[in-house]
């Protein structure tokens, strides 16, 4: 988890800054030495200044930050922090045979409404820990 966070820190402090916009478990590769690397930069965007705002809706719904869900989204690198948190949620379940994910069983509209209105539905990850 720390390696993913440091990878995002590197992207966000790089000049110019890179916003990944699709951080999720399937975009994290682990090599033979157990080192995690962020991959798939197909949706990444370069920010030319710290004041610039990105305005396009991309990414995978279950990992998207709420800033992305407005008709005219305006966001920055913080969307990667939300996505990383969802990825960490998944990683914390490595020992469970049946993994549950935030917003499991909800369609896209229900996920949008739950997150936007802060009616978060947690999948009970803590119950077996």
Question: What are the roles of these predicted feature ranges?
Answer:
Residues 67-78:
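Conserved end of the kinase activation segment
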Residues 6-18:
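Protein kinase catalytic-loop region centered on the HRD/HxD motif
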Residues 96-129:
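C-terminal lobe of the eukaryotic/viral protein kinase catalytic domain
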Residues 54-68:
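Conserved activation segment of eukaryotic-like protein kinases, specifically the C-terminal portion
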Residues 15-30:
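Catalytic-loop of the protein kinase fold
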């Amino acid at each position: 988890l720390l390696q993913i966070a440091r990878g995002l820190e590197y992207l966000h402090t790089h000049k110019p800054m890179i916003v990944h916009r699709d951080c999720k478990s399937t975009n994290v590769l682990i090599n033979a030495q157990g080192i995690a690397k962020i991959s798939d930069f197909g949706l990444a965007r370069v920010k030319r200044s710290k004041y610039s705002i990105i305005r396009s809706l991309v990414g995978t719904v279950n990992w998207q930050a709420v800033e992305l869900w407005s008709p005219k989204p305006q966001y920055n690198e913080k969307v990667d922090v939300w996505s990383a948190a969802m990825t960490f949620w998944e990683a914390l379940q490595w020992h469970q045979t049946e993994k549950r994910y935030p917003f499991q069983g909800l369609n896209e509209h229900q996920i949008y409404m739950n997150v936007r209105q802060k009616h978060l539905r947690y999948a009970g990850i803590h119950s077996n820990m």
